[in-house]
Amino acid sequence: TEEALQDINTASELADLIELRLDYINNIKVSDIETLIKAKARPVIATCRPKREGGRFTGSEDKRVALLERATDSGAEYVDIEHDVERSLINKFRKKAGTKIIVSYHNFSETPADAELKEIHQKLAGTGADVVKIVAFARNITDNLRIFSFLEGVRTPTIAFCMGELGQISRILAPKYGSFLSFASLEKGKESAPGQLSAKELLNVYNFRRINRATDIYGLIGNPVAHSMGPLLHNTCLREEGLNAVYLPFKVEDLPSFINGFKTLNVRGYSVTIPHKVTIMGLLDKLDPLVESIGAVNTVVNRDGKLVGYNTDSTAAVKVIEDGLAKDGDTLHGKKVTIVGAGGAARAVAFGLKQKGAGITIVNRTESRAETLAGDLKCQYKKFGELDKLNTAILINCTSIGMHPNIDDIPVPANVLRPGMLVFDAVYNPPETRLLREAAVRGCRTLDGVKMFVLQAAQQFELWTGRPAPLEHLERIVRTKLAGTQ
Ligand code: NAP
């Protein structure tokens, strides 16, 4: 009870309503309830969820009803009652003046089909509920679409969303589709259902209070997406530019059905990450010419319903290097560039630099991949073992060597680094890799991967909105976040 009192206090600073989960309070006594309800500075929903509906209450039904009754008698504005209780219990609470009834249905294994959702809603609304609550579980990201279209068709105040990581977007978009409320945890680790975001994340990352029916949607397509910095960066840009839009994480397994299904939401733009950068090309209406040569898309723009693919990894890397050279009045044209790596990042960087007239050499551990990329670029390639004879003006690391946690690894022998060489590392975690440290000691100019990472996001934002992104602010966010993960 003591801990609950503290939590009520904290919750009052974040939330519009507080759900008091009586089933989460150990050994709760009926007499404690009045103390808890009286402490509220916000309207309260009293819930005492039994195990059968996914809660923790294992006591008798009489005790459960007694706890809820004491809560409503003490002034709880809402009481949440499960759909499968005796109708007489619902009627009992309906007679209590000043208390509204939420009749709830939970499905922890799937999202019911459209017709079934309507049927459940009709049944719950028929009990005389003030608010109907239908909570499903998302097995696929497209399950959220059923919830959105269902919400748009109901008249009774209704709470509806999907649980689970794949259902998080339905919690964030609750105000857009008219859900009566959305639940958030008090802090990370205090979730009362799978997929719940913390209140601070909902408010500070997703700008929840700004979301309404007219809010545009952007998002990141990938798998996994849970640790991406994209939502923080893009939602910061959207807020600072005063745009009515939100950027969401889309964890996508089946890409074709996602792209097709989400057309109904008219998503304004996507970032694309592993593992979908190549496969998405075949699902778009148009590709930027640079994308056709690189063979990968990291950005999609919705232009009047047509999806157009771009690659800002490429343009961002080129800009970072050009800006680095420009400090000494230099340009890329005719420069000798060695790229270590032949994966997705190397392809994007190499094609961008080639367009600017650089002379490129590819070096990669798996020689056949170096040969293929060099063939596509019509440039030279070398064996990994030949790196000790390096003769280049610009050296770029596009491998994951040196990336957290293997921070002592270096992609080239340190003695090949010469004064005046420009060394760019695409790795951004950590920002200062061993390669960059050794390069600085030997008098090279250095550029880190954070600049590219921030710029590729900023260029996406510009492609979507036509507005410049707040670059310095974004760079600060990324560097602070990365400093916290070391
Ligand atoms: P990828 O497609 O998987 O390619 C990985 C590359 O690293 C391949 O060339 C691979 O060589 C090489 N590699 C990996 N481990 C190695 C090792 N132990 N020894 C030698 N070579 C090794 O990955 P990617 O998407 O190109 O990403 C590469 C790096 O760039 C990652 O660290 C990523 O974080 C970074 N990146 C940064 C940005 C940014 O905005 N700053 C953007 C994109 C990527 P093999 O061909 O022999 O396997």
What are these regions (language model features)?
Residues 84-216:
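Catalytic alpha/beta core domains of metabolic enzymes, predominantly
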Residues 215-327:
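Phosphate/diphosphate ligand-binding glycine-rich loop within oxidoreductases
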Residues 375-446:
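Rossmann-like adenosine-cofactor binding region
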Residues 18, 356-377:
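NAD(P)-binding Rossmann-fold cofactor-contacting core
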